[in-house]
């Protein structure tokens, strides 16, 4: 148990799923919580002490079924894998935590709503001002804000984070109140040092300063954002290059509504039995990306007259041109969730099939953009598109027409791309014919007919 106890000490707030052979095991209080949450058998293991240690586990192939249930129950889950082949090691197998899954750090489809974001937040206060940072690791969206409680509370209501990172030594009741039903995650106070936060952000974005992001006059927002990125690192979330920028939230650009206004307007739900929220009435979007965007628009109405005008002009164009607008809706309805698909690819959580689907989607978007060319209210959207023609051509030429979900399954690369790969495939598929060919060639070369 020495190895287990050492790893558990590194992740005291998480349920540690400890890989033992073909099972994930939990011990002690973790086992009690796991057995209760998953409704599995709780047993005991003799540890040589006066009392036996509680034990609960499940087969490793059931991880995708059980892990989301633990996270939905409000637990943080640390997944500990065997880092060596047990058959090749004498003694204790080396183990390590490879991933931490929390309510705010989730990629598993059963933990995410396709039509709404899943934000992880961080809060940091100094006097009357509060810094806020929000990231959705499944889409790469990253926001930061700074202001008094009256400004931060509406942002928290609009984004509704599922988990909030905070300074566990701060002791601020107002921050606790802001968290609402979100899962709290406390970090040590050194994580919230401004110099550390600035360096963390600058290193991530590869910039000398944060002025280009509009954060040079928002030190508390910088601290919150830096703490958020540190938390991702701590959770073994090593691949996060898809988080490419951070956007400053400002009260002058949007109408921010407090929790009472949102509730009374019934924007996202109804207090009446059988009732629905305004979002359910308005949402006729063609795909999950549109649904998440509409939810954002409803939670954060625009105040900028020019931005409002552009949006209204685009809607007016669609109403006046039903045929191209209808075809556009049909194409958008065909698309996969591009934001989350791209994130899975960037973080190494998917494979060739998603990559080909992404390339096909980009090609369809390019076709749609060509068809909509000349629609002046949409020009600002069309001009922002990168056709990625060379990338699409490479994917089309390299990947098989129906590649596997995972690269390890084989068959991802199309025939003719790599002669050596084609030769190995032929050997695997028809070794006898290859050997007969070699035999025939050697017989002809040597003049010996019966090799």
PLM feature segments, named:
Residues 1-317, 330-346, 350-440:
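Charged catalytic and DNA/RNA-contacting regions of genome-maintenance
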